[in-house]
């Protein structure tokens, strides 16, 4: 039997070694100058780069110190609007990523753009294979449609008043012109859209099976994206 002081001393040394390992594993690295091409601007004191990859309009915001493993949050639509979440994660060492999918409404065309951008970031820049998805309003369509196809690539989902059914918005809650853009993006007639079962509300099973955590911020009085419909 070991004496109590000896046991405590060994426990202390073991605990100290464990924390040293944790600090080494998760210690941040300083962002390298010249890693990103394109136009450099300021995003709330962080460096933002606007550039084109494979015909896609892209944005990256770089943390001052990059967390181990290169974690990142992927913003869908309305880049720069209400940036509190992005700023908080930048301070934690996350990159912020964005690729333009305007007027594609989470369609297969939008998913293809996201697939290509994901491949570029993970293969060319060593980003984490799992990302955090953030969608505001209509951004809900692409984050959920992409996640349903790629649940193994998603850490978690944060959505603010997300559109989860295009039969709610833009079909019922927007202009005829916007609804037609949505139909064109999906290459459907309205009759086909009404029979369509590929909206986020139809495809939650893959996310549940993968154990992906979801956080929604909603307003019960929201008339543009009604909670009951989405």
What spans do the regions from the language model cover?
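A domain-start/cap signature at the N-terminus of enzymes
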Residues: 31-68, 175-186
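Mobile cap/lid helix-loop segments that gate and shape the active-site cleft of serine hydrolases
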Residues: 40-45, 162, 167-206
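Short amphipathic alpha-helix adjacent to the substrate-entry channel of hydrolases
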Residues: 81-97
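Alpha/beta-hydrolase active-site loop
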Residues: 105-126, 145
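Gly/Ser-rich "nucleophile elbow"/oxyanion-hole loop immediately N-terminal to the catalytic nucleophile
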Residues: 116-137, 151-153
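Short glycine-enriched nucleophile-adjacent loop
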Residues: 140-151
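Short beta-strand/loop motif that positions the catalytic acidic residue
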Residues: 210, 215-218, 222
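Short alpha-helix in the alpha/beta-hydrolase fold that links the catalytic acid
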Residues: 212, 226-230
């Amino acid at each position: 039997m070991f004496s109590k002081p000896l046991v405590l001393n060994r426990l202390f040394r073991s605990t100290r070694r464990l924390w040293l390992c944790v600090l080494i594993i998760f210690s941040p690295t300083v962002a390298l100058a010249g890693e990103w091409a394109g136009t450099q601007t300021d995003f709330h004191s962080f460096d933002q780069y606007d550039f084109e990859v494979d015909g896609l309009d892209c944005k990256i915001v770089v943390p001052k110190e990059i967390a181990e493993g290169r974690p990142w949050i992927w913003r869908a639509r309305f880049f720069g609007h209400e940036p509190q979440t992005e700023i908080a994660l930048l301070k934690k060492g996350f990159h912020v990523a964005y690729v333009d999918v305007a007027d594609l409404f989470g369609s297969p065309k939008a998913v293809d753009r996201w697939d290509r951008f994901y491949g570029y970031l993970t293969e060319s820049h060593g980003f984490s294979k799992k990302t955090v998805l953030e969608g505001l309003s209509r951004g809900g369509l692409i984050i959920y449609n992409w996640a349903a196809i790629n649940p193994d690539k998603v850490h978690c989902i944060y959505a603010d008043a997300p559109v989860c059914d295009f039969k709610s918005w833009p079909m019922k809650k927007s202009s005829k012109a916007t609804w037609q853009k949505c139909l064109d993006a999906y290459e459907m007639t309205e009759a086909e859209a009404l029979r369509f079962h590929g909206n986020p509300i139809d495809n939650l099973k893959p996310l549940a099976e993968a154990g992906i955590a979801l956080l929604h911020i909603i307003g019960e009085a929201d008339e543009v994206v009604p909670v009951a419909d989405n």
